[in-house]
């Protein structure tokens, strides 16, 4: 096997990931302080793969399903936002392989079925979305990526293939009680930020154009469902830790510096919480950025179709709108 410096290569791989780390907004610490703390957790885990000359195995709970709210997304199926994110993840693995021949692989642990009833998206829609994600991987030649979902968990599917029952088994075997979840979330600011972010997602996703009820009632419902989503999400994380005990645990959300999880961006965004399935890809000055559909429409974005299917937007930077566009472009380049 080709010789390489274990410490140097391990540090280089970690640096590759740190370039895209999601931070908590308004963190009181410097980036250098945070990265030193993250390194204390992640470097030994990366080094364990390098010492054995094995591919770096990462897991990423992500790509559940599209938001049901047309104010945020283009439709129910993956579009340019997902495509660009998958291409980024695959290219990340390819870059690692340039200086570490065993390379890296990322297992996308699609979690839509884990909480479909709580996010008000039916299981058939989620299955269709996941099938399209796998098609995108195949069509784009993303050989470093693979997909794992609730239906692939043999320790659960040996009993049933019904998703309602699979969710019950997941909670029974891997979840803490909602009371324990609430107590943990209240322990620190990061827990509260997560709770508020999930609540906001659920509220926005339920604020459909045809909704005529009270916004206060919708907010209350979102707060109640938020704890359940976090409970299921953490249960899924516990299951994944059992299935892939050595894997580097990536996340779509900002994480504390002491966490085993490392939050990463998959494409530029103005929001440290926004994801491809909660937004659309908008091309601004030749660079794609994640935004909500309504935000793009307010900037007179032009909808682009590929093979007759809505794909993404292009925002032309006309002089009279430069004042609106510039803060977005600056945020993109800063990210």
Curated annotation (Swiss-Prot):
Catalytic activity: D-ribulose 5-phosphate + L-tyrosine = (2S)-3-(4-hydroxyphenyl)-2-isocyanopropanoate + hydroxyacetone + formaldehyde + phosphate + H2O + H(+)
GO molecular function: lyase activity
UniProt keyword Transport, yes or no: no
Record-listed E.C. numbers: 4.1.99.24
InterPro entries xref list: Isocyanide_synthase_DIT1 (IPR007817), PvcA (IPR017133), TyIsonSynPvcA (IPR054921)
A Pfam family annotated for this UniProt entry: DIT1_PvcA
Phenotype of null mutants: Deletion of isnA and isnB abolishes rhabduscin biosynthesis and decreases virulence of the strain.
UniProt entry keywords in alphabetical sequence: Lyase
Gene3D superfamilies, per the entry: 3.30.60.140
Annotated function: Involved in the biosynthesis of rhabduscin, a tyrosine derivative which is a potent inhibitor of phenoloxidase, a key component of the insect's innate immune system. Responsible for the synthesis of the isonitrile group on tyrosine using the C2 of ribulose 5-phosphate as the source of the carbon atom.
Family: Belongs to the isocyanide synthase family.
Protein name: L-tyrosine isonitrile synthase
Organism name: Xenorhabdus nematophila (strain ATCC 19061 / DSM 3370 / CCUG 14189 / LMG 1036 / NCIMB 9965 / AN6)
Top-level taxonomy: Bacteria, Pseudomonadati, Pseudomonadota, Gammaproteobacteria, Enterobacterales
Gene: pvcA
């Amino acid at each position: 096997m080709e010789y390489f410096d274990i410490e140097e290569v391990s540090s280089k791989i970690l640096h590759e990931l740190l370039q895209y780390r999601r931070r908590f907004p308004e963190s009181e610490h410097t980036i250098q302080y945070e990265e030193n703390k993250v390194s204390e957790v992640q470097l030994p885990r990366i080094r364990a793969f390098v010492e054995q000359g094995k591919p770096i195995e990462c897991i990423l709970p992500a790509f559940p399903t599209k938001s049901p709210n047309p104010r945020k997304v283009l439709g129910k199926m993956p579009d340019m936002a997902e495509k660009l994110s998958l291409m980024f993840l695959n290219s990340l693995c390819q870059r690692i392989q340039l200086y570490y021949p065993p390379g890296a692989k990322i297992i996308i642990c699609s979690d839509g079925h884990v909480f479909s009833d709580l996010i008000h998206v039916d299981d058939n829609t989620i299955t269709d979305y996941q099938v399209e994600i796998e098609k995108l991987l195949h069509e784009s030649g993303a050989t470093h990526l693979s997909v794992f979902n609730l239906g692939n968990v043999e320790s659960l599917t040996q009993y049933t293939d019904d998703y309602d029952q699979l969710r019950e088994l997941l909670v029974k075997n891997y979840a803490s009680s909602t009371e324990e979840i609430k107590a943990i979330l209240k322990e620190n600011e990061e827990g509260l930020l997560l709770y508020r972010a999930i609540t906001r997602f659920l509220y926005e996703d339920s604020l459909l154009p045809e909704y005529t009820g009270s916004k206060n009632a919708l907010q209350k419902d979102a707060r109640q469902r938020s704890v359940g989503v976090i409970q299921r999400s953490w249960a899924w994380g516990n299951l994944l830790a059992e299935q892939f005990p050595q894997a580097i645990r990536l996340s779509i959300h900002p994480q504390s510096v002491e966490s085993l999880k490392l939050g990463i961006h998959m494409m530029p965004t103005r929001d440290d919480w926004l994801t491809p399935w909660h937004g659309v890809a908008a091309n601004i000055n030749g660079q794609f950025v994640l935004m909500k559909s309504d935000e793009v429409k307010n900037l007179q974005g032009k909808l682009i179709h590929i093979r007759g299917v809505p794909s993404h937007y292009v925002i032309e930077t006309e002089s009279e709108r430069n004042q609106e566009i510039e803060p977005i472009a600056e945020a993109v380049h800063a990210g």
